[in-house]
């Protein structure tokens, strides 16, 4: 099993969620996050004063899937989240040792 963490632009969340549901992903965790990468931040002017905004708002989607579903999920996220502009985000793929469904005690892929 693998955990896929995708950091994407917030306005792409609904499109990515719908695409993941369409390919059979039954659950995900979504967190509002802030960060910066190569694009760094940007400058804004508020009431005549210039401010540097270092951390940009992003959304983190976390999904745990079977090994055989990883590429399909990654391709779906890339296809739907990509704008072609700086700041589109990143995807991380992390090994998952076990999953336990708290309600039933099920373990492994049955608990996904």
Curated annotation (Swiss-Prot):
Tell me yes or no: is DNA-binding among this UniProt entry's keywords: no
| PROSITE patterns, per database record | PII_GLNB_CTER, PII_GLNB_DOM
Enumerate the UniProt keywords alphabetically: Nucleotide-binding, Phosphoprotein, Transcription, Transcription regulation
Report the residues modified as O-UMP-tyrosine.
Answer: 51
- Which SMART domains does the record match to this protein? P-II
Q: Name one GO molecular function term.
A: enzyme regulator activity
Record InterPro entries: N-reg_PII (IPR002187), N-reg_PII-like_a/b (IPR011322), N-reg_PII/ATP_PRibTrfase_C (IPR015867), N-reg_PII_CS (IPR017918)
- Give Gene Ontology CC terms: cytosol
Asked if the record carries the keyword Metal-binding, the reply is no
Q: What biological function has been recorded for the protein in this entry?
A: In nitrogen-limiting conditions, when the ratio of Gln to 2-ketoglutarate decreases, P-II is uridylylated to P-II-UMP. P-II-UMP allows the deadenylation of glutamine synthetase (GS), thus activating the enzyme. Conversely, in nitrogen excess P-II is deuridylated and promotes the adenylation of GS. P-II indirectly controls the transcription of the GS gene (glnA). P-II prevents NR-II-catalyzed conversion of NR-I to NR-I-phosphate, the transcriptional activator of glnA. When P-II is uridylylated to P-II-UMP, these events are reversed.
Q: How does it assemble?
A: Homotrimer.
This chain belongs to which protein, by name? Nitrogen regulatory protein P-II
Source lineage: Bacteria, Pseudomonadati, Aquificota, Aquificia, Aquificales
Instruction: Provide the gene name from the record.
Output: glnB
């Amino acid at each position: 099993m693998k955990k896929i963490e995708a950091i994407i632009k917030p306005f792409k969340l609904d499109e990515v969620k719908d695409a993941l549901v369409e390919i059979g992903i039954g659950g995900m965790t979504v967190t509002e996050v802030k960060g910066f990468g190569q694009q760094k931040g940007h400058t804004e002017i508020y009431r005549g004063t210039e401010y540097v905004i270092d951390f940009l708002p992003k959304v983190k989607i976390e999904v745990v899937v079977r090994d055989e579903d990883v590429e399909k999920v990654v391709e779906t996220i890339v296809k739907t989240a990509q704008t072609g502009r700086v700041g589109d985000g990143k995807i991380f793929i992390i090994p998952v040792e076990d999953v336990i469904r708290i309600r039933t005690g099920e373990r492994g892929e049955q608990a996904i």
